[in-house]
Swiss-Prot record:
Protein's UniProt name: Polyribonucleotide nucleotidyltransferase
Reaction equations catalysed: RNA(n+1) + phosphate = RNA(n) + a ribonucleoside 5'-diphosphate
GO-annotated cellular components: cytosol
Enzyme class label: transferase
GO process annotations (BP): mRNA catabolic process; RNA processing
Natural source organism: Citrifermentans bemidjiense (strain ATCC BAA-1014 / DSM 16622 / JCM 12645 / Bem)
Domain of life: Bacteria
UniProt cross-references to Pfam families, sorted A to Z: KH_1, PNPase, RNase_PH, RNase_PH_C, S1
Annotated positions binding Mg(2+): 483, 489
Length: 696
């Protein structure tokens, strides 16, 4: 049976339908707003695999090319590996729903969101977030939903829910929020140095906006009436748990206070091994359970120590930032480079400048576009003392890179003022928490080292949360273990003036306004401290580019002269690049960017282009080349492709019988422009140029 519900979200109608398509899935909905439609399915296997120790949730998001009336541009003409945008949308769907499954539900579960129709004004990613929740709500899969997503923008001081493409262009912030009826579950976005108070208002504006969508999902679930699966409660061996606690608790109290990560992990592993050995005879085959109870002990002890004593794993209080060291110009041949170290987290970051040919081509639902700023984040296994087989970057690397890219993009100069393609690469060389924020700091330093005139330095910090009942502690600059054992990972990046990017994920049922406000305020204090540490090394962009970076000079020509620059079949522009070795980019407005690491080559290219587009001026002297001898005079080329006639009467002060007595083809001759007729024909005189000196 087909069931349909509708919700109004700030003037836009969202329709959710189930029971018509993909009926063999555990749950399936078609969600629509405007002309954008997404099919979202949820399937969970009937039982968990034997020995399954984690929740295997997979989220897939795919944009079908036909949804935008396009044929894929790849060689095979079909959809292939996910684009970065599809990968990022998968993460947006996954992160708010993952904490809402029961802890003991370990069945293979897959969410698939397929964009089947798309307009430019209704974001399919937002609809996919809502659709994933709705598909789970109408299924028999246990899920503590609903949740809903919304994108918030601000134009002329007014907040807008799910802005159109035109409104997004004018907006000074873009934040995606996922929320339940009572709390915020996830936040991600960027802003143009917006204050913490304004961000908080935007987030809770979004929370209010999604309430009708949440109500519609509850209505749909009620209409469908599917009963949820019964999940057996986990059986806990209380006797074993008590024995593990008795044997290991005192040792664990000391181990969790060891300040260095490797030594701490070795100590905890040693306690686990000793406990397994001590209990192996009494509780045969219980090694996995024993190690699970050791992990529970670590979880409880770390959190208790923070809540009761205000002291963290490495001895810091809740607000202290780890020691920071910075270095720039680390790599002599890179255009800009930095080494950023914060505690046991370290990143080498390099900035490279390129031209328009280096722009990334993006093939999307809405057509081709070009990307002029890229940040790539790499997390090699050695950074955490591990080994693995590395192929393409994973979802986490793409997500962390995009967060850092958004943070830095807000301070870039306008492309007209700095017409370079910029690529930042961050290689994490050590990691113990907050490597994406180390990338932001290192990226800012490397751009300043490269001489990119950024608006202001940017720093980032990761905040954590430990919440027990009504008590909570907010942690600045979290360690990896604090991320793992805590309830929130809240990354905030920005300048001294305001926030440029943020991302919040939680592992509990939601966070309140009070917690978010306190976290943002504490993050600001931490960010200002980090900016101060960075400024000790470099506080503003260098005044010049690296000697190894291309110099781009911009000149303009009249639009009707573009064809003269290019020439037939590209002949003219090719002759310039071959003669000078420069890279030239021409757009249809007459703007020409000339790039070269050699100033002399660039100057020569400019001169050659000026010659190609130059127009004769009456009364001006020109050094020309005789192209053709006629009985009535000689044709002299004064610019490439532009010549004029020197009539026989204008060859000399005395009467000339034969033109060839004075000039021959190929001769260089100084002439003066004495007129241009209505047809644009140029009249030249050698006679009037005699005795004059030519200067370019």
């Amino acid at each position: 049976m087909v069931h349909t519900v509708q919700a109004e979200c700030c003037g836009k109608t969202i329709t959710i339908e189930t029971g018509k398509i993909a009926k063999q899935a555990s749950g399936a909905v078609m969600i629509k707003s405007g002309d954008t439609m997404v099919l979202v399915t949820a399937v969970a296997m009937k039982s968990a695999k034997e020995g399954q120790g984690f929740f295997p949730l997979t989220v897939n998001y795919q944009e079908k090319a036909y949804a935008g009336g396009r044929i894929p541009g790849s060689f095979f003409k079909r959809e292939g590996r996910p684009s970065d945008n599809e990968t990022l949308t998968c993460r947006l769907i996954d992160r708010p729903i993952r904490p809402l499954f029961p802890e003991n539900f370990l069945n293979d579960t897959q969410i698939m969101a397929t964009v089947v129709s798309a307009d430019k004004d209704n974001d399919p990613g937002i609809l996919s977030m809502i659709g994933a929740s709705a598909a789970l709500m109408v299924s028999d899969v246990p899920f503590a939903g609903p949740i809903a997503g919304v994108k918030v923008g601000r134009v002329d001081g007014q907040f807008i829910a799910n802005p159109t493409a035109e409104q997004e262009e004018k907006s000074d912030l873009e934040i995606v929020i996922a929320a339940s009826q009572d709390a915020i579950l996830m936040v991600e976005g960027s802003a143009c140095e917006v204050s913490e108070d304004d961000l908080l208002e935007a987030i809770f504006f979004g929370h209010k906006a999604v309430q009708p969508v949440l109500a519609a999902q509850l209505e749909l679930a009620k209409k469908v009436g599917t009963s949820k699966r019964e999940i057996p409660a986990p059986v806990v061996n209380e006797a074993l748990k008590a024995r593990v606690s008795a044997l290991a608790k005192e040792g664990m109290k000391q181990a969790v206070r060891i300040k260095t990560k490797v030594e701490r992990h070795l100590a905890i592993d040693a306690i686990a091994d000793e406990t397994v050995a001590a209990l192996s005879a009494e509780f045969e085959g219980s090694e996995k359970e024993i190690k699970g109870f050791i992990e529970d002990l670590e979880y409880d002890l770390v959190r208790e120590h923070i809540i009761k004593d205000g002291q963290r794993i490495d001895g810091r209080d809740t607000k202290t930032i780890r020691a920071i060291s910075t270095e720039v110009s680390l790599l002599p041949r890179a255009h800009g480079s930095a080494l950023f170290t914060r505690g046991e987290t370290q990143s080498i970051v390099a900035a490279t400048l390129g031209t328009s040919v280096d722009e990334q081509r993006i093939d999307s639902l809405y057509g081709d576009s070009r990307k002029k700023f890229m940040l790539h984040y790499n997390f090699p296994p050695y950074s955490v003392g591990e080994t693995s087989f590395r192929l393409a970057p994973g979802r986490r690397e793409i997500g962390h890179g995009m967060l850092a890219e958004r943070a830095l993009q807000q301070v870039l100069p306008k492309h007209d003022d700095f017409p370079y393609t910029i690529r930042i690469v961050s290689d994490i060389t050590e990691s113990n928490g907050s490597s994406s924020m180390a990338t932001v700091c290192g990226g800012s330093l490397s751009m300043m080292d490269a001489g990119i005139p950024i608006k202001a330095p940017v720093a980032g910090i990761a905040m954590g949360l430990i919440k027990e009942g009504d008590d909570f502690a907010i942690l600045s600059d979290i360690l990896g273990d604090e991320d793992h054992l805590g309830d929130m990972d809240f990354k905030v990046a920005g300048t001294a003036e305001g926030v440029t990017a943020l991302q919040m994920d939680i592992k509990i049922g939601g966070v309140t306004r009070e917690i978010m406000s306190a976290a943002l305020a504490q993050a600001k204090a931490g960010r200002i401290h980090i900016l101060g540490e960075m400024a000790k090394t470099i506080g503003a962009s260098r005044g010049d580019l690296s000697a190894f970076a291309p110099r781009i000079t911009t000149i303009w020509v009249k639009v009707d002269k573009i064809r003269d620059v290019i020439g037939s079949g590209g002949k003219n522009i090719r002759s310039v690049t071959e003669a000078t070795g420069v890279s030239i980019d021409i757009d249809d407005t007459g703007k020409i960017n000339i790039a070269s690491t050699n100033k002399e080559a660039c100057d020569l290219a400019i001169k050659m282009i000026r010659n190609l587009t130059a127009e004769a001026e009456e009364g001006k002297l020109y050094m020309g080349t005789v192209k053709k001898i006629m009985e009535f005079g000689a044709f002299v080329e004064i610019f490439p492709g532009t010549d004029g006639l020197v009539h026989v009467s204008e060859l000399d002060t005395e009467r000339v019988k034969n033109v060839s007595d004075i000039l021959k083809e190929g001769d260089k001759v100084l002439v003066k422009c004495i007129g241009i007729d209505k047809q644009g024909k140029i009249k030249l005189s050698r006679k009037e140029a005699l005795g004059l000196t030519f200067t370019e």
